[in-house]
UniProtKB/Swiss-Prot annotation:
The lineage of its organism: Eukaryota, Fungi, Dikarya, Ascomycota, Pezizomycotina. GO terms for cellular component: nucleus. It comes from the Eukaryota. SUPFAM superfamilies: Zn2/Cys6 DNA-binding domain. It is found in: Nucleus. Residues 1-26, 591-620 are annotated as: Disordered. This is Notoamide biosynthesis transcriptional activator notL'. It comes from Aspergillus versicolor. One of its GO terms (molecular function) is DNA-binding transcription factor activity, RNA polymerase II-specific. The keyword Nucleus applies.
């Protein structure tokens, strides 16, 4: 055989396309597709990759898993450009569109609706003639849903920013350990604790803030005013107040709650002040999140714990030391604070409160509380909190309301039986109407720089709404009309005036919610406020034809919808209103139609509320 026959034949020169493929294969790939990861193959990166094409399988590449700096920056730039383009297109739509299309959508957006809810409203609730005139809006909503399909954009970061991008820092520092095993970040725990004491605690005041923070800073598990149970459930509830949390911290909210329940079971019936307070927050969380059975169990445990603690405090020997005496005072304040919260829940449930009024009167300070309140996380200079003044006023209001139990907690329908009022009920009605006039200057309804003062007045008007709504349906016997104040006498003797007083208070609740939203946003209201909003909505339901009542109903529905983004309970209440409106053949304002839609159901299963053609009024 000639030598030439032994030489190997050279391969042909690579074509341009083959060279390009080879170059792609040699390119560094930051992350592989899911199929290549599962089969442990080298991936070419760009979907569809060569392996998936060869195997004829779907190629799925999660680009967010690529943690290289260039990839992260590129995704961030693309996201910002997409948001800028989306904002410009929405502004153009609102600028050029008429009120028939824009105002209901604007009201829905203001209620913190998610992109799928907005798209569902446009595709299934917006009249077909208007949808065909605004195809660009349909396209915008599709882009929104595509952008959010893998990574939802948070509505608001935990550190909300002001227009100039500044934010405040928490004015306390507490350790995560040894109080919680869920997270170890002291800074995040401090922010959540301060957030809860900023927005929830002033109105739901049954924890001594200063002693709790002092003991939490100490890190001692034998502390008298702090415990892991109490810390974990406060952290869980604080996550509800911090809307727009990242997904990982949203899951931590559930873990905090489950950890608190585990720690409660570990107590095995032992009762202490932090345990009772932790039960109080657990009960609040279970109620607002729709866990009715858990709420009933926690409420029963809470009532028993408070009775046991109160008996121990009342039986202190006269030679008890200062710490024991201080603890007894704080137990009494805790009892009153939880009674106040129980009355708010009982008002809407129309049931007697699970906690009876404490036997000992609340401790009253003759000096105004000069502690400062800051609208964290937004930067603010701070205003005097007046927390102790508000606590005293709330206790006085609930003592009055408790004496009107027949009005507040009755579940009877309209009755023709004559209603005989006792002297105690007449006195309570007089005190209820005079309560607001006797408040100190720092708690007047015109004070709009403290959200908890607004919540207090919402609650007062909710009581008035329910009481006068009850009186309008029952004939009364008033043996001595001159003994009553003019307002009470007119309401008692004229059902029409009683109903007018009820609607007036409902409209005032709507006004206060607008003030709160303008100053701090709807998603900063404490969960207990939703009961006041729902009481006003049910009162206004039969009178939405009146323009003033109509506007109030729209703003209250938007506020309730904002609550439903954070908790489950308002969702069921809104559906209840929707069903009652259908049963009574009530035509609801069309501006509220979007708030009652369920975006998880297809359009064929949704039953729209009867409404007239909207000219619309935006929620200002």
């Amino acid at each position: 055989m000639p030598p030439s026959s032994k030489s190997r034949r050279l391969p042909p020169a690579a074509s341009d396309s083959a060279a390009s493929d080879a170059q792609k294969r040699r390119k560094n790939v930051g992350t592989a597709c899911s199929a290549c990861k599962a089969r442990k193959l080298k991936c070419t990166g760009a979907p569809p990759c060569a392996n998936c094409v060869k195997s004829r399988i779907e190629c799925t590449l999660d680009e967010t898993a690529d943690r290289r700096r260039r990839g992260v920056l590129k995704r961030k730039i693309d996201k910002l450009e997409d948001q800028e383009d989306l904002l410009g297109r929405l502004l153009e739509f609102f600028r050029e569109g008429n009120n028939r299309c824009t105002i209901p959508l604007l009201n829905l957006i203001r209620s913190h609706a998610s992109p799928p809810e907005i798209r569902f409203y446009i595709e299934h609730q917006l009249p077909l003639s208007k949808r065909t005139q605004t195809p660009e809006l349909i396209e915008v909503c599709r882009e929104i849903e595509q952008r959010h399909s893998f990574e939802p954009l948070p509505k608001r970061h935990i550190l909300d920013t002001t227009p100039n991008g500044s934010h405040d820092t928490p004015r306390l520092s507490v350790p995560a350990q040894p109080w919680t095993s869920i997270i170890t970040d002291d800074g995040l725990v401090s922010r959540l604790i301060f957030l809860w004491f900023t927005w929830v605690h002033p109105f739901c005041n049954f924890i001594d803030r200063d002693r709790f923070i002092r003991d939490m800073k100490s890190g001692s598990l034998s502390a008298s005013y702090c415990s892991p149970l109490l810390v974990n459930i406060i952290l869980s509830d604080a996550c509800h107040s911090a809307s727009g949390l990242p997904d990982d911290l949203t899951s931590k909210r559930i873990e905090f709650y489950e950890e608190a329940e585990r720690l409660l079971d570990k107590e095995e019936g032992r009762i202490s002040l932090p345990t009772a307070q932790g039960l109080g927050v657990l009960w609040m969380c279970a109620s607002i999140t729709g866990r009715d059975r858990q709420a009933w169990i926690k409420g029963t445990q809470l009532a028993y714990s408070l009775r046991e603690l109160s008996q121990v405090s009342c039986n202190l020997p006269s030679e008890a030391n200062r710490d024991a005496t201080a603890l007894a005072t704080i137990v009494n304040s805790t009892n009153w604070g939880l009674f106040n919260v129980a009355m708010v829940h009982a008002l809407f449930a129309r049931k007697r409160p699970i906690i009876e009024p404490p036997a000992q009167p609340p401790s009253v300070s003759n000096q105004c509380d000069h502690g400062m309140w800051y609208s964290y996380p937004n930067k603010s200079t701070g205003v005097e909190s007046h927390t102790s003044c508000l606590f005293t006023a709330a206790c006085n209001l609930n003592r009055i309301a408790y004496n009107l139990g027949r009005f507040l907690f009755s579940q009877e329908k309209k009755s023709s039986a004559r209603l005989d009022l006792t002297d105690g009920e007449l006195d309570a009605l007089r005190d209820l109407n005079e309560w607001a006039d006797q408040l100190p200057v720092c708690l007047k309804e015109s004070i709009a720089d403290l959200p908890h003062v607004l919540s207090l007045h919402m609650y007062n008007h909710a009581i008035l709404t329910v009481v006068y709504g009850f009186l309008r349906t029952r004939p009364l016997y008033l043996p001595n009309p001159s003994a009553s104040t003019p307002t009470v006498r007119d309401a008692l003797m004229s059902p029409a005036r009683a109903w007018a007083a009820s609607l007036s208070s409902a409209r005032k609740i709507a006004h206060l919610t607008l003030v709160h939203r303008a100053n701090w946003g709807s998603d900063r209201m404490p969960g207990a406020t939703v009961h006041c909003i729902m009481a006003a909505l049910f009162a206004l339901l039969d009178s939405v034809d009146d323009p003033a009542n109509r506007d109030a109903f729209i703003s209250l529905t938007a506020a309730a919808a904002a609550f439903s983004r954070r908790w489950e309970s308002p969702i069921a209440l809104l559906r209840n209103i929707q069903n009652i409106a259908r049963q009574r053949d009530v035509t609801l304002p069309p501006e509220t139609g979007a708030f009652f839609l369920d975006p998880d159901q297809p359009s064929g299963n949704s039953t729209p509320i009867k409404s007239e053609t909207p000219e619309g009024t935006a929620i200002s």
